[in-house]
C-alpha cells in the first residue's frame, strides 16, 4: 500500500492554519496552488459529505467525493477521498500542533493500493508538496489577525 506523508512548519498559530485549511472560501486558493478545486458542501463536521470540484482532465471527471470522518478543531481533520467512480476509497488526515511558536502541519493521504495506487500516490504527492510549500504559505501570508483575507 502506498501513502503520502508531508510535514511542514508554519509561523502562524494553529487556529490561523486551521482556518486556512477548513474555510471553503480559502481552500481553492491553496489547493493545487490556486488552481485547485472548490470544496462544495464542506463543513468541518463529522458526517458532512462534500466534493472537491475542479476542471476535468483526460481520464478524470474533475470531482472527488469526500466525507468528513473525524474533527477535533483545531488539531485534526480526517476525511475519505474517492477520486473516480468505483475507485479506491482513500483517507486524508490533517494534524496540526503548536510547534516552535507556530504550527506543525502533518498531511497524510493513505489507502492507495496496487500499481495504479502507487502511481496515483506519486502524482498526488508531488502536487500536495507544492500546495503545502507554495500555496498554503501564500494564503497564510494574506490573512489578517482576525483570519480574514487582506484586500
Could you say what each language-model-derived stretch is?
Residues 1-38:
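Hydrophobic ligand-binding cavity/cleft-lining segments
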Residues 5-6, 15, 23, 40, ...:
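Hydrophobic/basic alpha-helical segments enriched in Actinobacteria
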Residues 111-151:
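A conserved amphipathic terminal alpha-helix motif
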Amino acid at each position: 500500500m502506498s501513502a503520502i506523508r508531508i510535514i511542514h512548519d508554519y509561523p502562524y498559530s494553529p487556529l490561523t492554519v486551521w482556518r486556512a485549511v477548513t474555510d471553503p472560501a480559502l481552500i481553492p486558493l491553496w489547493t493545487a496552488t490556486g488552481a485547485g478545486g472548490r470544496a462544495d458542501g464542506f463543513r468541518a463536521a463529522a458526517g458532512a459529505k462534500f466534493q472537491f470540484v475542479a476542471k476535468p482532465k483526460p481520464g478524470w471527471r474533475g470531482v472527488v467525493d469526500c466525507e468528513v470522518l473525524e474533527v477535533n478543531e483545531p488539531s485534526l481533520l480526517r476525511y475519505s477521498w474517492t477520486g473516480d467512480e468505483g475507485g479506491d476509497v482513500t483517507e486524508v488526515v490533517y494534524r496540526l500542533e503548536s510547534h516552535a511558536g507556530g504550527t506543525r502541519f502533518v498531511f497524510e493521504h493513505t489507502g492507495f493500493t496496487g500499481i495504479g495506487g502507487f502511481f496515483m500516490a506519486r502524482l498526488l504527492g508531488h502536487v500536495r508538496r507544492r500546495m503545502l510549500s507554495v500555496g498554503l504559505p501564500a494564503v497564510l501570508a494574506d490573512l489578517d489577525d482576525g483570519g480574514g483575507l487582506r484586500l
